[in-house]
């Protein structure tokens, strides 16, 4: 017999009308965190649409925090900025690793993009612009995470967990090791 089931989660979960179960993204992250790291951990999920900090204690969701509806602290922001620089997301991280941070002070994607355009117009090094862009997202994620009392084990999920550079920068900002998912 086939014991397989379909579970839908995330923003598109309501569109999967054939799902056997619908489970919130936060609950799924907590279950994954528990499997990876045990009953006490924090999950930082930097997705395309939002950023979530999920605290797991006793194997259950203890608390969570989401960013506001602005995309400036998300993967989408980095995609937009990489596109503006004419590079892929991976190339953006590679460039950032070689650059010196140029500050991106705007909290809004549209205004931050204007800052990037101005830097390009000034002839600033693309590596420095890339470093500023990645640093900006890491700052926003760290500020959200530091609103919570993070346990020793912190896991990074979402597309940015594929970037060793972003993981390194976020770890520095939090003052503790952040482990990417495998």
Question: Which functions belong to the PLM regions below?
Answer:
Residues 58-104, 108:
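Glycine-rich phosphate-binding loop plus the immediately following alpha-helix
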Residues 1-7, 50-52, 81:
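Conserved phosphate-binding loops in N-terminal lobes of ATP-dependent enzymes
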Residues 12-44, 49, 54-59, 142, ...:
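Conserved phosphate-binding catalytic cores of ATP/NTP-utilizing and phosphoryl-transfer enzymes
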Residues 112-146, 150:
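Adenine-nucleotide phosphate-binding core of ATP-dependent small-molecule kinases
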């Amino acid at each position: 017999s086939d014991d397989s089931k379909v579970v839908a989660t995330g923003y598109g979960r309501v569109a999967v009308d054939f799902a056997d179960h619908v489970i919130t993204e936060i609950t799924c992250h907590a279950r994954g965190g528990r499997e990876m790291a045990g009953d006490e951990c924090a999950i930082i999920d930097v997705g395309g649409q939002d950023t979530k900090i999920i605290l797991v204690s006793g194997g259950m969701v203890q608390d969570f925090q989401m960013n506001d509806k602005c995309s400036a602290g998300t993967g989408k922001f980095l995609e937009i900025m990489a596109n503006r620089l004419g590079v892929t997301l991976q190339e953006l991280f590679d460039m950032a690793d070689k650059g010196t941070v140029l500050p991106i002070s705007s909290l809004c994607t549209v205004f931050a993009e204007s800052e990037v355009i101005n830097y390009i117009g000034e002839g600033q090094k693309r590596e420095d612009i890339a470093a500023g862009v990645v640093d900006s997202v890491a700052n926003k994620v760290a500020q959200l995470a530091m609103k919570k009392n993070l346990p020793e084990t912190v896991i990074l999920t979402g597309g940015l967990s594929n970037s060793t550079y972003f993981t390194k920068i976020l770890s520095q900002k939090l003052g503790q090791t952040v482990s990417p998912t495998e």
